[in-house]
């Protein structure tokens, strides 16, 4: 075993030499009472230092005992236990007075609550009210988020200062940016969406005013203005009202003002109706939330007030229109016994049909039962008749002859792959009908059929011009049947006289009626119409134009309705743009024509009353002695006596 070196006693430095004992301060609180506090962090720190020193001493003792070996006596263990108990007791005695001093100090030191004066007692209620926003604020915040998405570079997010843009405050008198707009929304500075729209325009206009057109800021402002106006358009706002719940609750500026006034008046009434003996704090009253019934009552009152305001505005508009009409409109109530059967709730009526075609009961040709009434609508199937389709088996396909040119002696001469008849039948068909198509001959024949009257009409028109209508008269005379007693000699004499008259008339008026001749040529011999005035001529031209438009409309409708719809469509094809345009032109022409004539020239009085739904009261039948049941009963003898004597008597 090696020799162990003993440590010199001078090398042992107890913990007390390095750690200074904490100083104690005496605080006098409330006069005679004294409390001791150490300059350390607390009495707990001083006890910590003492525990550490005792722990080091205990370690040294253990080392000495190990060196002595197993020579210890059992009585030493008892002394060790007693010493340990005393040390523990001494530790507790040292710690106890410090803790008591701390407790006394805590009890005697006055407590100062440092509460910020700005924070109210009911902070939770105020915070809850701050979170709740009006529908207008939620709508504006939604629009602001959409607008800011159109500014990815954040050019308009914060205010512009002179440090960023020199001379900005001198050029732009009313600056605007997204942060300012958000602050105004938070402070309820906007009363309508139009105000937000104006500020947005101002922001973009300021950027376009300060920057040059070739800069990125000018281009970004122009692009943002274009996209922002689409977002703030009425169509987009209406679509948002349908898709977002709080957008549907938007009210106009006037309605919001009415709501504020109504809420103020409601608060005053509720405040006056409360018991005066109950003291209510002002702050507590401000943060109290209203009951559901109170909210519902306020909502009903608000709706009633808004309805009354809308009626008042409509009444003001009606009065203004009556004043501006210059006597054409009046508020006088007509003392009439007629009533409108088709009258709308707002007091207006419409003219159903100008010239009614539907017959009513009692009129000639009236049919009370129609096919549509008995059969009803088609529940299944297609909306068109089944078209004719030729069976493929009825189609004759002859053989096809092949021609390979020279040096093809052993090649097949015809191909019967797709033929359904024999070669002999094919030869018979080819020899009868040939191989050339007859489309050209058919087209010429169709052209001659359609235009055979045109050359004759042109020739007759030219002859009428040269003979001043004598040619047409001669044709009419020739076409009329001659009398049976007239012979061939008389016919030849009549023809000679007609020819002489035509030649004389041709020589007399050769140079005087050139304009008339041209008009006759353009009208293909039709007699020219002469009008009494220029207005009548214009009216007739308008009628002719309307007639032409109606024919074109009919042709367009026939073309659309006769077109076979695709198999995937069940309903009929809708009217085309051409039909809509023609119908609009016809309507405008008829409207202009109807304005130039009196109503009696277009339709009868009965027709107008029937179309408007005006029912005339029946005459009083008390004075009449006619029995109205005669038409529905069997014919009987009826003796009618004047009412002064007695009523009608039936025998």
Swiss-Prot record:
UniProt region (Disordered), positions on chain: 36-133, 257-298
Cell location: Nucleus; Chromosome
Keywords, in A-Z order: Bromodomain, Cell cycle, Chromosome, Coiled coil, Nucleus, Transcription, Transcription regulation, Tumor suppressor, Wnt signaling pathway
Coiled coil: 533-564
GO biological process, one term: Wnt signaling pathway
Domain of life: Eukaryota
Biased composition (Basic residues): 58-69
SUPFAM superfamilies in the record: Bromodomain
InterPro entries: Bromodomain, Bromodomain-like_sf, Bromodomain_contain_prot, DUF3512
Start-end of Basic and acidic residues biased regions: 70-105, 271-298
UniProt cross-references to PANTHER family, sorted A to Z: BROMODOMAIN CONTAINING PROTEIN, BROMODOMAIN-CONTAINING PROTEIN 7
Protein task: Acts both as coactivator and as corepressor. May play a role in chromatin remodeling. Participates in the Wnt signaling pathway. Transcriptional corepressor that down-regulates the expression of target genes. Binds to target promoters, leading to increased histone H3 acetylation. Coactivator for TP53-mediated activation of transcription of a set of target genes. Required for TP53-mediated cell-cycle arrest in response to oncogene activation. Inhibits cell cycle progression from G1 to S phase.
Protein name: Bromodomain-containing protein 7
Species of the source: Gallus gallus
Lineage, highest ranks first: Eukaryota, Metazoa, Chordata, Craniata, Vertebrata
Name of the encoding gene: BRD7
């Amino acid at each position: 075993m090696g020799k162990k070196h003993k440590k010199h006693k001078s090398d042992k430095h107890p913990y007390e030499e390095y750690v200074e004992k904490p100083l104690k301060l005496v605080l006098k609180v409330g006069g005679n009472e004294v409390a001791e506090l150490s300059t350390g962090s607390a009495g707990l720190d001083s006890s910590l230092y003492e525990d550490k020193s005792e722990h080091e001493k205990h370690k040294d003792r253990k080392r000495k005992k190990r060196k002595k070996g197993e020579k210890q006596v059992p009585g030493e263990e008892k002394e060790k236990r007693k010493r340990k108990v005393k040390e523990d007791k001494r530790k507790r005695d040292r710690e106890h007075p410090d803790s008591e001093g701390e407790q006394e100090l805590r009890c005697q030191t006055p407590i100062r609550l440092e509460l910020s004066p700005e924070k109210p007692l009911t902070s939770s209620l105020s915070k809850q009210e701050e979170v709740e926003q009006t529908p207008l604020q939620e709508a504006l915040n939604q629009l602001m988020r959409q607008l800011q998405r159109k500014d990815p570079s954040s050019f308009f997010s914060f205010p512009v200062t002179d440090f960023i843009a020199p001379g900005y405050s001198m050029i732009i008198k009313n600056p605007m940016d997204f942060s300012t707009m958000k602050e105004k929304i938070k402070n309820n500075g906007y009363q309508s969406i139009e105000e937000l729209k104006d500020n947005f325009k101002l922001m973009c206009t300021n950027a376009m005013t300060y920057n040059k057109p070739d800069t990125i800021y000018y281009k970004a402002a122009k692009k943002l203005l274009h996209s922002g106006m689409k977002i703030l358009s009425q169509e987009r706002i209406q679509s948002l009202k349908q898709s977002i719940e709080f957008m549907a609750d938007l009210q106009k500026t006037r309605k919001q003002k009415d709501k504020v006034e109504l809420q103020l008046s409601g608060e005053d009434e509720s405040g006056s109706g409360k018991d005066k003996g109950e003291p209510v704090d002002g702050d507590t009253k401000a943060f109290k939330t209203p009951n559901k019934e109170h909210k519902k009552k306020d909502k009903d009152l608000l709706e009633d007030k808004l309805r009354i305001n809308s009626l008042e505005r409509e009444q003001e508009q009606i009065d203004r229109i009556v004043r501006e009409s210059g006597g054409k409109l009046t508020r006088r109530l007509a003392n009439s016994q007629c009533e409108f059967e088709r009258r709308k709730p707002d007091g207006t009526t419409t003219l159903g049909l100008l010239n009614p075609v539907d017959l009513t009961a009692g009129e000639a040709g009236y049919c009370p039962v129609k096919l549509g009434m008995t059969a009803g609508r088609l529940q299944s199937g297609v909306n068109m008749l089944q078209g004719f389709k030729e069976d493929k088996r009825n189609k004759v396909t002859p053989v096809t002859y092949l021609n390979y040119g020279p040096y093809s002696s052993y090649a097949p001469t015809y191909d019967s792959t797709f033929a359904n008849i024999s070669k002999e039948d094919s030869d018979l068909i080819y020899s009868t009908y040939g191989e050339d198509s007859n489309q050209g001959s058919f087209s010429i024949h169709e052209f001659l059929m359609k235009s055979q009257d045109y050359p004759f009409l042109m020739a007759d028109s030219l002859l009428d011009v040269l003979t001043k209508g004598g040619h047409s008269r001669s044709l009419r005379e020739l076409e009329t049947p001659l009398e049976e007693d007239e012979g061939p000699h008389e016919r030849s004499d009549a023809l000679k006289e007609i020819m002489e008259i035509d030649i004389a008339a041709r020589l007399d008026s050769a140079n005087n009626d050139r304009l008339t001749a041209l008009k006759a040529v353009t009208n293909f011999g039709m007699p020219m119409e002469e009008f009494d005035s220029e207005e009548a001529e214009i009216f007739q031209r308008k009628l002719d134009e309307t007639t032409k438009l109606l024919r074109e409309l009919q042709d367009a409708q026939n073309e659309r309705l006769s077109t076979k719809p695709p198999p995937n469509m069940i309903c009929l094809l809708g009217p085309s743009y051409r039909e809509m345009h023609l119908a609009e032109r016809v309507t405008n022409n008829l409207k202009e024509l109807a304005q130039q004539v009196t109503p009696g020239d277009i339709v009868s009085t009965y027709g107008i009353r029937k179309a408007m739904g005006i029912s005339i009261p029946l005459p009083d039948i008390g004075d009449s002695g006619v029995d109205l049941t005669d038409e529905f009963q069997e014919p009987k003898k009826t003796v009618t006596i004047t009412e002064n004597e007695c009523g009608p008597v039936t025998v």
